[in-house]
Amino acid sequence: VALGFEGGLRPGNLLYLNRGDLGFPRDQGGATRALFVVLRHSKTRERRDAARYQHVRITCATVAALLDRAFGQRDRAAALFSWPGNHAARSRQMSARFAAGLRALGVPYGQAQGYTLGGLRGGGITAYFEATGDLQLTRWRGRWDSMRSMEHYIQELASHEAFARLPPPARARIFRLAGLLGLFVQP
Protein backbone atom coordinates (compact mmCIF):
# COMPACT_ATOMS: atom_id res chain seq x y z
CA VAL A 1 0.00 0.00 0.00
CA ALA A 2 2.78 2.45 0.93
CA LEU A 3 4.66 1.75 -2.30
CA GLY A 4 1.56 2.19 -4.47
CA PHE A 5 0.48 5.40 -2.74
CA GLU A 6 3.87 7.09 -2.36
CA GLY A 7 4.99 6.09 -5.85
CA GLY A 8 1.68 6.82 -7.57
CA LEU A 9 1.73 3.31 -9.03
CA ARG A 10 -1.00 1.38 -10.78
CA PRO A 11 -1.89 -2.00 -9.23
CA GLY A 12 -0.42 -3.71 -12.30
CA ASN A 13 2.90 -1.92 -11.74
CA LEU A 14 3.09 -3.41 -8.25
CA LEU A 15 2.47 -6.96 -9.44
CA TYR A 16 5.39 -6.91 -11.88
CA LEU A 17 8.00 -5.57 -9.45
CA ASN A 18 10.87 -7.65 -8.16
CA ARG A 19 13.47 -6.75 -5.54
CA GLY A 20 15.93 -5.68 -8.23
CA ASP A 21 13.49 -2.98 -9.33
CA LEU A 22 13.88 -1.25 -5.96
CA GLY A 23 17.03 0.86 -5.79
CA PHE A 24 17.62 1.53 -2.10
CA PRO A 25 20.20 4.18 -1.15
CA ARG A 26 22.68 1.48 -0.05
CA ASP A 27 22.32 -0.19 -3.48
CA GLN A 28 23.57 3.06 -4.99
CA GLY A 29 26.53 3.43 -2.66
CA GLY A 30 24.70 5.85 -0.39
CA ALA A 31 25.03 8.62 -2.99
CA THR A 32 21.34 9.47 -2.56
CA ARG A 33 18.75 9.19 0.18
CA ALA A 34 15.98 8.46 -2.31
CA LEU A 35 14.54 5.08 -3.20
CA PHE A 36 14.19 4.54 -6.95
CA VAL A 37 11.58 2.15 -8.35
CA VAL A 38 12.13 0.95 -11.93
CA LEU A 39 8.97 0.12 -13.86
CA ARG A 40 9.82 -2.42 -16.54
CA HIS A 41 6.18 -3.13 -17.38
CA SER A 42 4.64 0.32 -17.56
CA LYS A 43 1.33 0.92 -19.30
CA THR A 44 2.99 2.92 -22.10
CA ARG A 45 6.13 0.83 -22.68
CA GLU A 46 4.94 -0.43 -26.08
CA ARG A 47 4.45 3.04 -27.55
CA ARG A 48 7.20 4.07 -29.95
CA ASP A 49 7.55 7.51 -28.40
CA ALA A 50 7.65 6.26 -24.80
CA ALA A 51 10.58 5.28 -22.62
CA ARG A 52 11.16 1.54 -22.43
CA TYR A 53 11.45 1.74 -18.67
CA GLN A 54 10.07 4.35 -16.34
CA HIS A 55 11.08 5.10 -12.78
CA VAL A 56 9.68 6.68 -9.66
CA ARG A 57 11.71 8.48 -7.01
CA ILE A 58 10.50 8.06 -3.43
CA THR A 59 11.95 10.56 -0.98
CA CYS A 60 9.85 9.81 2.11
CA ALA A 61 12.39 8.30 4.51
CA THR A 62 9.73 6.41 6.48
CA VAL A 63 8.30 4.74 3.38
CA ALA A 64 11.79 3.89 2.12
CA ALA A 65 12.67 2.35 5.51
CA LEU A 66 9.41 0.38 5.57
CA LEU A 67 10.05 -1.00 2.08
CA ASP A 68 13.66 -1.79 2.98
CA ARG A 69 12.47 -3.75 6.00
CA ALA A 70 9.88 -5.63 3.94
CA PHE A 71 11.90 -6.32 0.80
CA GLY A 72 15.52 -5.19 1.27
CA GLN A 73 17.02 -8.57 2.17
CA ARG A 74 15.36 -10.52 -0.63
CA ASP A 75 17.22 -11.88 -3.61
CA ARG A 76 17.22 -9.28 -6.39
CA ALA A 77 15.28 -11.64 -8.70
CA ALA A 78 12.53 -12.32 -6.13
CA ALA A 79 9.08 -10.96 -6.92
CA LEU A 80 7.77 -8.50 -4.34
CA PHE A 81 4.33 -10.11 -4.47
CA SER A 82 4.90 -13.76 -5.26
CA TRP A 83 1.44 -15.24 -4.90
CA PRO A 84 0.77 -18.26 -7.11
CA GLY A 85 -1.11 -18.08 -10.39
CA ASN A 86 -1.19 -15.96 -13.50
CA HIS A 87 -1.31 -12.17 -13.53
CA ALA A 88 -5.12 -12.07 -13.18
CA ALA A 89 -5.10 -14.46 -10.20
CA ARG A 90 -2.33 -12.47 -8.51
CA SER A 91 -4.27 -9.26 -9.14
CA ARG A 92 -7.36 -10.74 -7.47
CA GLN A 93 -5.22 -11.87 -4.52
CA MET A 94 -3.76 -8.38 -4.09
CA SER A 95 -7.23 -6.80 -4.24
CA ALA A 96 -8.59 -9.31 -1.73
CA ARG A 97 -5.76 -8.59 0.72
CA PHE A 98 -6.23 -4.85 0.31
CA ALA A 99 -9.97 -5.23 0.95
CA ALA A 100 -9.31 -7.37 4.04
CA GLY A 101 -6.99 -4.71 5.45
CA LEU A 102 -9.57 -2.00 4.89
CA ARG A 103 -12.33 -4.10 6.46
CA ALA A 104 -10.14 -4.60 9.53
CA LEU A 105 -9.85 -0.82 9.83
CA GLY A 106 -13.57 -0.29 9.25
CA VAL A 107 -12.95 1.50 5.96
CA PRO A 108 -15.45 0.92 3.12
CA TYR A 109 -14.09 -0.96 0.12
CA GLY A 110 -15.34 -1.18 -3.46
CA GLN A 111 -16.18 0.89 -6.52
CA ALA A 112 -19.65 1.86 -5.31
CA GLN A 113 -18.95 3.33 -1.88
CA GLY A 114 -15.35 2.93 -0.87
CA TYR A 115 -11.67 2.74 -1.55
CA THR A 116 -10.09 0.48 -4.16
CA LEU A 117 -6.53 -0.61 -4.87
CA GLY A 118 -6.65 1.47 -8.06
CA GLY A 119 -7.27 4.58 -5.96
CA LEU A 120 -3.78 4.43 -4.45
CA ARG A 121 -2.32 6.01 -7.59
CA GLY A 122 -4.78 8.89 -7.73
CA GLY A 123 -4.72 9.42 -3.97
CA GLY A 124 -0.93 9.39 -3.87
CA ILE A 125 -0.63 11.79 -6.78
CA THR A 126 -3.18 14.15 -5.27
CA ALA A 127 -1.43 14.07 -1.88
CA TYR A 128 1.88 14.78 -3.63
CA PHE A 129 0.39 17.81 -5.39
CA GLU A 130 -1.17 19.05 -2.16
CA ALA A 131 2.23 18.77 -0.44
CA THR A 132 4.31 20.39 -3.21
CA GLY A 133 1.87 22.62 -5.09
CA ASP A 134 4.08 21.99 -8.13
CA LEU A 135 2.32 20.83 -11.30
CA GLN A 136 5.53 19.91 -13.15
CA LEU A 137 6.85 17.76 -10.30
CA THR A 138 3.43 16.15 -9.97
CA ARG A 139 3.37 15.43 -13.70
CA TRP A 140 6.80 13.81 -13.42
CA ARG A 141 5.68 11.73 -10.42
CA GLY A 142 2.61 10.52 -12.34
CA ARG A 143 4.63 9.85 -15.50
CA TRP A 144 2.20 11.72 -17.78
CA ASP A 145 3.02 13.14 -21.20
CA SER A 146 -0.09 15.30 -21.13
CA MET A 147 -0.98 17.95 -18.57
CA ARG A 148 -4.62 17.16 -19.32
CA SER A 149 -4.27 13.57 -18.05
CA MET A 150 -2.73 14.83 -14.84
CA GLU A 151 -5.44 17.43 -14.35
CA HIS A 152 -8.11 14.72 -14.35
CA TYR A 153 -6.45 13.01 -11.41
CA ILE A 154 -5.96 16.16 -9.40
CA GLN A 155 -9.38 17.67 -10.12
CA GLU A 156 -11.37 14.49 -9.48
CA LEU A 157 -9.71 13.35 -6.28
CA ALA A 158 -9.83 15.14 -2.99
CA SER A 159 -8.15 12.70 -0.62
CA HIS A 160 -8.61 14.91 2.43
CA GLU A 161 -12.38 15.02 1.81
CA ALA A 162 -12.55 11.24 1.44
CA PHE A 163 -10.70 10.79 4.73
CA ALA A 164 -12.97 13.27 6.49
CA ARG A 165 -16.02 11.27 5.38
CA LEU A 166 -14.76 8.08 7.03
CA PRO A 167 -16.56 7.02 10.20
CA PRO A 168 -14.79 8.42 13.30
CA PRO A 169 -13.88 4.92 14.60
CA ALA A 170 -12.16 4.12 11.28
CA ARG A 171 -10.18 7.38 11.38
CA ALA A 172 -9.14 6.61 14.98
CA ARG A 173 -7.92 3.11 13.97
CA ILE A 174 -5.93 4.59 11.08
CA PHE A 175 -4.26 7.14 13.36
CA ARG A 176 -3.41 4.42 15.90
CA LEU A 177 -1.92 2.23 13.17
CA ALA A 178 0.07 5.17 11.78
CA GLY A 179 1.38 5.85 15.29
CA LEU A 180 2.78 2.32 15.45
CA LEU A 181 4.79 2.70 12.25
CA GLY A 182 7.75 4.14 14.13
CA LEU A 183 8.04 0.91 16.12
CA PHE A 184 8.73 -1.02 12.93
CA VAL A 185 11.00 1.31 11.02
CA GLN A 186 13.66 3.87 11.80
CA PRO A 187 14.17 6.24 8.84
Where do the protein language model's features map onto the residues?
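Eukaryotic short linear interaction motifs
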Residues: 11-12, 22-25, 45-48, 88-91, ...
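Residue-level marker of regulatory loop/turn positions in helix-turn-helix DNA-binding domains and
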Residues: 3, 90, 117-118
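Mobile genetic element proteins and their domesticated derivatives, centered on retroelements
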Residues: 3, 8, 14, 39, ...
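Catalytic-site neighborhood detector that most strongly recognizes the C-terminal catalytic loop/helix
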Residues: 142-169
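Short, charged phosphate-coordinating catalytic segments
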Residues: 3-33, 134-140
